[in-house]
Amino acid sequence: MAAISRRDFLQKSAAVVVATLGSTVGPFVGLSARAANAGPKFAAQNGGYGPLVAVRDLRDGVERLFLPEGFQYRSFGVRNTPLTEEATLTPGRHDGMAVFSWKQGKVRIVRNHEQTQPNPVGAFGDLGHAYDPAAPGGTTTLEISPTADAVSSWVSLNGTTFNCAGGASPWGTWLTCEETPNGVDQQRSFLIGPNDPDDLTYTQKHGYLFEVPVSRGPGELEVADPIVAAGRFAHEAAAVDPGTGDVYMTEDDFAYASGFYRYRPPNRPDEDKRIADGGALQILGVIPPGASEPVTMDLHADQAPGTTYRVAWIPIEVPDPEFAPGLSNDEAARVVFQEGESKGGARFSRLEGMDYFDGKIFFVSTEGGGPFDSDPPPNGSAGFGGGYGQVWMYDITNETLTLVFESPGPDVLDFPDNITVSPRRKSVILCEDSSAGNMLRALTRDGLIFDFALNNVASGVDEFSGATFGPGGQVLYANMQANGITYAIWGPWSNGLI
């Protein structure tokens, strides 16, 4: 089997990796500032795992992934294959997901489907239980053995749209996020091509957070209720503070600056086993040194890794706006953020994946770290930011925000998206969403990068998404989005830094 690495796919960057993860960074205690002397810092021996090699899929023998030697995987839940528990084909565009312990040693996965384009038959699954029969997104639930050699599957939410990332709750639910506010009052999506109809005929407002119980079994689909007080914007990911039930949320407005939000439910979700509507939405603002109030700052550029800010949480008075006739897609997407920005809310580039660990929220800015950018970018097509990615950390107890990593170039880290913390406290796993050679990569507690998995399907163009560890931390689950494949990956974790 031929060995392969990231450096075989992309030209090495001459930039310098600077990574600072101080003693406040949860599982990364003891990490000190690093400045490379001659170039990027990659973990020795690829994080202890050695080079990546082509590995056959235990499902059918096809070599879909490159992994460190000794690791195995099985694919399942593939797009357009029949769901086992109902007469529906598996939807595509697999994205964020979470894995929960279930009965008889099995696990349940609740998985997003980031489908957005008009669907000739509307929502997948039972239209009678769809939130919006015209909307093609939602979630499926899969019940599997830990290594996916036995699978059952069904629809657990339908009639939503652009279900991107999300997050697991401590009380056994999946929070799924709609990444567009297009709806009955703003039909024209930026995703619609020139040959598509002007009207998508949405019947409901969109751009919300929804909650899906992992206990929802086959035949138990219900019409979903959005948590409208958690905001109507381009939701990306969610993470829950188990101590308070507060929900932290990222926004990915692609061509414009985005915000980092907190929703404070009016109930105790850990007691009610659900998040109630009617709470308070807030946006994060940073307080510069010497100041006493938050000041609107651009955090996508000119930020040194290791920089820490005090923060303030700014109330959003109109979390669920109605869009006036004639409002453009871009204008509609920015309504909630612009209220927060006008009050001192921080400006980030494309906030995407997020994970809670040990009192800290780690979240990703996909195109942060570049030169200062404008709203929208001058070329009109690239995302706001122009960088290769940042990793931020919010300390809940100390109410501080720290830039813990910034990629200097595509050979180091290229457009990170979803993120998950290793249960062994050694690293975070990052899903790349770039144009070629996409990988699962690890950022260690010493600020070093190494490769863990390389896509060998469709010439590596397809992005990884939804990476998350199962109960016990021995199996890593991840999706290949456009091809619509889910993987269960396991092997000798103790050999290296994951």
Language model segments and positions:
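Loop/turn-rich, solvent-exposed surfaces of beta-rich toroidal or solenoidal domains
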Residues: 366, 408-448
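Beta-propeller domains
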Residues: 297-398
